């Protein structure tokens, strides 16, 4: 066959007359002269693709379930490239080379542009129908296996110009945690408490008189608010505080639902059958999320939730001995409270310790919060009213704490409902030195004993020595080694916790920790922190980039990686608005980034036609990616073993946009990681492609032991030679070890195997040390945040040539073995969530920039005289055919030589259309009459070429 016929009909045309055609284009009704684009909010009502109308930050975590299956737009490009590799290997070796199919499997799994499609399937004539706003495409089911959408976010036509060539960069940066807004961690009086004045005294030396309260300047039962006069006196220890529970408005409905379950349980003679543990868990999870973090990262609560449900069943059983103690008749006890008492005991047993607001599991902290609404300070009341004590198997400190009351809880400033002027407690976090004045000769070794600082964090020599001995004897213990264990308890910021350290003592007097309102200097992290009062300056905003307090943490997405102690901040993806909108305003982060003094200079590195004033999200993300590259290379250059002995002083790590120029264009974080080794150890300036870089990292991560070393030797021979030396004698010999974490910590489609663990890092201070850098899901430690600021310290020229100490030398073998065996990034990911967001981001981008343009793309195989493809696309006419053809070609980065022809059909608002062809394809548009119906037909010809059969693509996809 050398000719293909595609009828173009209207909705009035009887489709039975064209049911035998392989492809039919059905035009939608004509639209008016005022037509300006598509209303994408109607996508959920059409058979297009699975995007819901929801807040954009919810949408990026949405699991597509309302669809008929998924399609991978680049599957043909990958399959053909794999076929070519297979063919070449057979010619060279005479046998199949097994890794090419493994490569294809990996490419499919690694893809981030999977499309969850909603289609109509017509059983009467076996066709699949794909909807667009401008037309419908009917495809014979035998030929529908490669059909996909090819939508475009149009570039704005006014003001600064967009650059929508590589729009996947936005999704990529977000998945790598490189597009986040930040708010400092914040604490308030628990909104589940009403704190009132119970008594007052003149000086802290006086005793509060039991049974004879006095009120000097305050009123009896006067409520205490952060920042008011009552609070100021409370902070000075002059007020005895009474704690009562209260229900915050935000969870009033959930508490009412719990009360209804409670009342039914009481009326039903306390039978356990009235306690639906799953229902309770769901309500408590909702409370936990609403009160602490509405958009926390999803955690796999399934196992813990089941344990909690079993504990609830046990605790509400009538034969439970502890329940019977709770039910003993004593004054102040009542059935209404007993319900919440049993619930929080079950939560505590599930957690095997006291539950706090900061508990990572919403259902457990929800149980605590719900109980606080009724009981006030839960554990104090359990001990004093219900004679229940925390178990001896809990943490030892929990036993002491049940005699005290804890009145502050951590809240998320992104969600906090607070008016300007409201007082809160927050953590101020600053870098001690944003830029160091250094020289190559002197290096930048950490000063662990700074002159300034009210409180200074210090290493504990005994604990450090114990860790070193463990490494020598047993190897690197990634689950056991913790940085907080390496520091002295006094002034240890990794042990600070305002929720646990601000309390009411046994006489209900407020006690603040000694570090409150004091700067703690943490030289090993180049940080100083201080908890103090601050005023809220902005109301809650839909834009997460808006700073809430008068003294916020200020850093852009890349600079944030230098703030090592992530527990003192909260992060949120810097997106605002909804998933589907015709026009909306983006987050102000783009304006802020475009004002960066180095914006134009950094973007100029790309040697692309960019508008250096553009606030287009794609341009700002390209800026961030280039800045990320420069910061990593500026930092790690000093960890390469070779360095000139130069006494010239300079600022470090000051970014110089003219440095580290490459041959090639940067599109992916994986390119940065791979080029680190190429640049410094292999002396290559050429930037590997995205696919090659991701493949290299995959091979390294999926191998282990000697096999991993072989993979390193294959791609980075000079680096691997450095790992193979027989004896590490000098400091310079071990400097390459700090490059190893970069192979494992980043990725847009990975999840860490462990929730929290530590990797070894060489640390340069007055002596060479080995320290555990903590990685994991807690405290936002994803990517390079866990190690980057530690890398700001590097040895002097003389230190590089010094002999290693015996203890460090003895640890190098175990450290190398750890990095050759570790499987950091082998955690399970929700592939259907991670890989299906390309359509979402393109649609969201269209609402910010120039609008939404749609297309459907499919392919036909050519079998003779050479095997190749032609692409066919039907689209709206909102952009030029030339741009659309360029977009089609970009789907074939690996096998573009096999795409021999393109047919591009553009449908105008008035429902006329035009056809453009390229390559081996020619076309004619003719009129066709069938009975009383008349339509257009597009005759597509490939002179000298023969179309392949229906299953040629199937065979290709199953090589």
From Swiss-Prot:
GO terms for molecular function: structural molecule activity. Keywords: Capsid protein, Clathrin-mediated endocytosis of virus by host, Host-virus interaction, Inner capsid protein, Viral attachment to host cell, Viral penetration into host cytoplasm, Virion, Virus endocytosis by host, Virus entry into host cell. GO terms for biological process: clathrin-dependent endocytosis of virus by host cell; virion attachment to host cell. The keyword Cell cycle does not apply. It is found in: Virion. GO terms for cellular component: viral inner capsid. Pfam families: Orbi_VP2 (PF00898). The VP2 protein is one of the two proteins (with VP5) which constitute the virus particle outer capsid. It is the major target of the host immunogenic response. Responsible for viral attachment to target host cell, probably by binding to sialic acid. This attachment induces virion internalization predominantly through clathrin-dependent endocytosis. Belongs to the orbivirus VP2 family. This is Outer capsid protein VP2. It comes from Bluetongue virus 13 (isolate USA). The lineage of its organism: Viruses, Riboviria, Orthornavirae, Duplornaviricota, Resentoviricetes. The gene is Segment-2.
């Amino acid at each position: 066959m050398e000719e293909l016929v595609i009828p173009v009909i209207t909705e009035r045309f009887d489709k039975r007359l064209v049911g035998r055609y392989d492809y039919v284009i059905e035009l939608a009704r004509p639209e008016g002269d005022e037509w300006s684009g598509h209303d994408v909010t109607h996508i959920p009502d059409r058979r297009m693709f699975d995007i819901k109308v929801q807040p954009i930050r919810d949408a990026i975590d949405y699991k597509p379930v309302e669809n008929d299956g998924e399609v991978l737009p680049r599957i043909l490009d990958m399959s053909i490239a794999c076929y070519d590799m297979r063919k070449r290997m057979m010619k060279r070796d005479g046998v199949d080379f097994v890794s090419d199919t493994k490569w294809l499997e990996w490419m499919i799994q690694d893809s981030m542009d999977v499309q969850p499609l909603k289609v109509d399937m017509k059983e009467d004539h076996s066709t699949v129908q794909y909807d667009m706003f401008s037309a419908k495409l009917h495809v014979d089911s035998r030929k529908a296996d490669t059909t996909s959408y090819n939508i475009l976010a149009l570039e704005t036509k006014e003001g600064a110009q967009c650059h929508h060539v590589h729009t996947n960069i936005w999704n990529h940066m977000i998945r790598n945690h490189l597009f986040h807004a930040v708010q400092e961690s914040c604490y308030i009086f628990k909104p589940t408490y009403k704190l009132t004045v119970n008594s007052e005294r003149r000086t802290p030396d006086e005793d509060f008189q039991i049974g004879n309260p006095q009120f000097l300047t305050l009123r009896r039962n006067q409520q205490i608010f952060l920042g008011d006069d009552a609070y100021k006196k409370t902070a000075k220890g002059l007020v005895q505080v009474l704690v009562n529970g209260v229900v915050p408005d935000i969870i009033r409905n959930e508490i009412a639902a719990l009360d209804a379950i409670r009342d039914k349980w009481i009326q039903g003679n306390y039978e356990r059958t009235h306690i639906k543990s799953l229902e309770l868990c769901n309500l408590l999870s909702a409370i936990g999320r609403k009160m602490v973090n509405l958009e926390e990262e999803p955690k796999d609560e399934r196992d813990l939730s089941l344990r909690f449900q079993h504990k609830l069943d046990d605790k509400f059983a009538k034969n439970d001995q502890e329940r019977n103690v709770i039910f003993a008749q004593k004054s102040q006890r009542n059935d209404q409270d007993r319900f919440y008492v049993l619930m929080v005991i079950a939560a505590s047993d599930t957690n095997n310790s006291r539950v706090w607001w900061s508990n990572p599991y919403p259902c457990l902290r929800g149980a605590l919060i719900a109980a606080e609404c009724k009981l006030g300070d839960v554990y104090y009341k359990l001990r004093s009213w219900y004679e229940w004590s925390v178990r001896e198997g809990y943490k030892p400190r929990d036993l002491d704490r049940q005699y005290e009351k804890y009145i502050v809880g951590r809240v998320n400033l992104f969600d906090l409902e607070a008016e300007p002027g409201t007082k809160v407690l927050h953590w101020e976090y600053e870098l001690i030195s944003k830029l160091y004045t250094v020289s190559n000769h002197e290096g930048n070794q950490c000063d662990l004993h700074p002159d300034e600082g009210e409180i200074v964090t210090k290493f504990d020599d005994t604990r450090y020595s114990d860790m070193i001995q463990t490494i020598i004897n047993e190897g690197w213990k990634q689950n056991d080694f913790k940085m907080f264990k390496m520091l002295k308890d006094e002034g240890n910021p990794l042990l600070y916790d305002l929720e646990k350290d601000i309390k009411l003592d046994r006489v209900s007097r407020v006690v603040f920790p000694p570090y409150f309102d004091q700067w703690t200097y943490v030289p090993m992290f180049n940080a100083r922190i201080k908890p103090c009062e601050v005023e809220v300056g902005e109301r809650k905003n839909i834009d997460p980039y808006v700073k809430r307090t008068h003294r916020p943490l200020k850093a852009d997405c890349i600079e944030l990686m230098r703030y090592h102690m992530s527990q003192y901040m909260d992060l949120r993806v810097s997106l605002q608005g909804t998933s589907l909108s015709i026009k909306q305003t983006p987050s102000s982060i783009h304006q802020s980034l475009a004002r960066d003094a180095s914006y134009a200079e950094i973007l100029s590195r790309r040697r692309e036609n960019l508008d250096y004033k553009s606030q287009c999200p794609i341009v700002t993300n390209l800026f961030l990616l280039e800045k990320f590259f420069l910061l990593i290379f500026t930092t790690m250059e000093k960890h390469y073993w070779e360095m000139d002995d130069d006494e010239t002083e300079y600022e470090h790590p000051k970014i110089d946009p003219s440095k580290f120029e490459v041959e090639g264009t940067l599109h992916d974080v994986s390119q940065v990681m791979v080029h680190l080794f190429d640049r410094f150890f292999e002396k290559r300036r050429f930037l590997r492609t995205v696919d090659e870089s991701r493949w290299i990292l995959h091979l390294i991560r999926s191998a282990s032991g000697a096999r991993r070393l072989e993979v390193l030797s294959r791609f980075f021979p000079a680096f691997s030679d450095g790992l193979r030396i027989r004896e590490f004698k000098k400091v310079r010999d071990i400097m390459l070890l700090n490059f190893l974490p970069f192979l494992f910590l980043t990725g847009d489609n990975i999840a860490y195997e462990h929730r929290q663990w530590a990797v070894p890092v060489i640390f340069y201070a007055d002596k060479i040390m080995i320290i555990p850098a903590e990685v994991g899901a807690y405290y936002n430690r994803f990517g390079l945040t866990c190690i980057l600021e530690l890398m700001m310290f590097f040895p002097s020229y003389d230190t590089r040539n010094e002999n290693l100490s015996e203890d460090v030398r003895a640890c190098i073998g175990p450290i190398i073995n750890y990095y050759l065996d570790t499987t950091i990034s082998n955690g399970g990911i929700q592939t259907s969530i991670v890989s299906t967001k390309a359509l979402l981001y393109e649609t969201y981008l269209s609402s910010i920039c120039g609008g939404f343009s749609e297309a459907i793309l499919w392919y036909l195989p050519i079998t003779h005289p050479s095997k190749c493809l032609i692409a066919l696309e039907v689209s709206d006419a909102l952009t030029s055919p030339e741009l659309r053809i360029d977009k089609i070609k970009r789907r074939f980065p690996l096998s573009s030589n096999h795409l021999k022809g393109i047919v591009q059909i553009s449908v105008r608002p008035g429902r006329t259309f035009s056809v453009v062809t390229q390559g081996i394809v020619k076309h004619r548009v003719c009129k066709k009459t069938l009975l009383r119906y008349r339509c257009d037909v597009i005759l597509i010809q490939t002179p000298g070429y023969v179309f392949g059969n229906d299953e040629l693509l199937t065979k290709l996809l199953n090589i």
